[in-house]
Structure formats: structure tokens, C-alpha cells
């Protein structure tokens, strides 16, 4: 995955932080980051060894943990770019969702999501809150018969949080993806429909 975000003022600093949740089924394999100043010059490279790991959980027993990096570059505006790879172990019941707007008061210039599956493996998806928001999902077939799904969003205006207003789930556009046939831990099944 790749995330590039430009921070324009102090209110947006939290959006520059990196977070990746892991557990016995998901692990962070690769990571790199880069901070770019207002002049477009790379001022800092971030390595996986600089990530902090936390195993804090409100549950009594869990194997969940997460990696995070707090990006606190002092000069605004700046851009931060993260690239990472997550490995799924013991099967998969869902792919990461496409959520181009991550928080209130953030706009999106361009967001893309692409999933490519080998021939014979199906993927289903469900769009929520995408009507009239400039989000498109297109399916195609690759040269070797693979299923390709691409979701795009461009020029999304920020959603302003209103006191006592609707929740994130009612406002923000997103697309969920899941394999039609799955294997998870020691279970197998078919979820061809929702």
C-alpha cells in the first residue's frame, strides 16, 4: 500500500502519523517512509526499524499489536509518503477497504485502489455512500484471465464535522472487498453473496 498526504496546518498533523494493525493473521513485511518539505525536497527517510510497536489492548488476552510512527515535522506545509506491505497468514476473509477520505476536514486530490486476482478466484465488493461523490469502481479482465477491480476517487471535498451531526459511517464514502471463496485459519467457505 502507498499513502501520500500533505499537511497544510497544525490541525492536520495527526493525519501524518502511520498506523498498521497486525495479529496472528496479518504481519507487516516491508515499510518505508519519506518526509518532503514545501520545496519538494526529501528531508528525511523513515525506516521500518524506526516504527514503534505496541501490544496494548483493552482485552484480557489478545495477540493483536500495531506499528506506529508519529510524524512531527516542524515546518509546514510538508508531505509524508508511506509504502508498506502486509502479509496475510492462515487465510483471508476480506481485503483492505477503499476509504479515500480518512477523517473529517480532509480533502482528497486523488485516490486509487487496485485489486488483481488470479483467474478462477472471484472478488465481490460493496459501495457505501459513494453516490454523487466522484467515486468509480470498474471491473475488467486481464490478459491472463485475472479479475481486475479498480476504484478511483478524485477531488473529494472535505467533510466538516458538525456538533451532533451524523457519524463517520453515515457520511464517508467507502468500498468493501471480499473474496468469494475464503480460507481462514482452519475453516473454508463460500461468500458469493452478501
Task: Give a label for each model feature.
Residues 87-97, 101-194:
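Secretory-pathway-linked proteins and extracytosolic
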Residues 1-114, 150, 181-185, 193:
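Lumenal/extracellular ectodomains and adaptor appendage modules
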Amino acid at each position: 500500500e502507498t499513502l501520500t498526504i500533505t499537511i497544510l496546518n497544525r490541525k492536520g498533523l495527526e493525519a501524518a502519523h502511520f498506523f498498521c494493525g497486525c495479529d496472528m493473521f496479518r504481519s507487516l513485511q516491508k515499510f518505508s517512509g519519506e518526509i518532503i518539505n514545501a520545496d519538494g525536497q526529501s528531508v528525511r527517510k523513515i525506516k521500518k526499524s524506526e516504527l514503534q510497536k505496541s501490544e496494548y489492548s483493552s482485552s484480557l488476552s489478545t495477540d493483536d499489536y500495531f506499528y506506529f510512527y508519529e510524524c512531527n515535522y516542524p515546518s509546514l506545509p510538508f508531505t509524508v509518503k508511506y509504502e508498506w506491505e502486509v502479509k496475510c497468514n492462515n487465510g483471508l476473509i476480506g481485503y483492505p477497504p477503499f476509504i479515500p477520505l480518512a477523517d473529517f476536514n480532509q480533502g482528497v486530490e486523488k485516490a486509487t485502489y487496485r485489486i488483481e486476482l488470479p483467474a478462477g478466484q472471484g472478488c465481490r465488493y460493496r459501495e457505501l455512500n459513494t453516490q454523487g461523490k466522484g467515486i468509480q469502481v470498474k471491473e475488467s479482465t486481464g490478459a491472463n484471465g485475472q479479475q481486475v477491480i479498480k476504484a478511483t476517487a478524485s477531488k473529494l471535498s472535505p467533510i466538516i464535522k458538525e456538533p451532533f451531526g451524523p457519524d463517520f459511517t453515515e457520511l464517508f464514502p467507502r468500498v468493501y472487498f471480499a473474496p468469494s471463496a475464503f480460507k481462514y485459519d482452519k475453516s473454508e467457505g463460500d461468500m458469493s453473496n452478501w
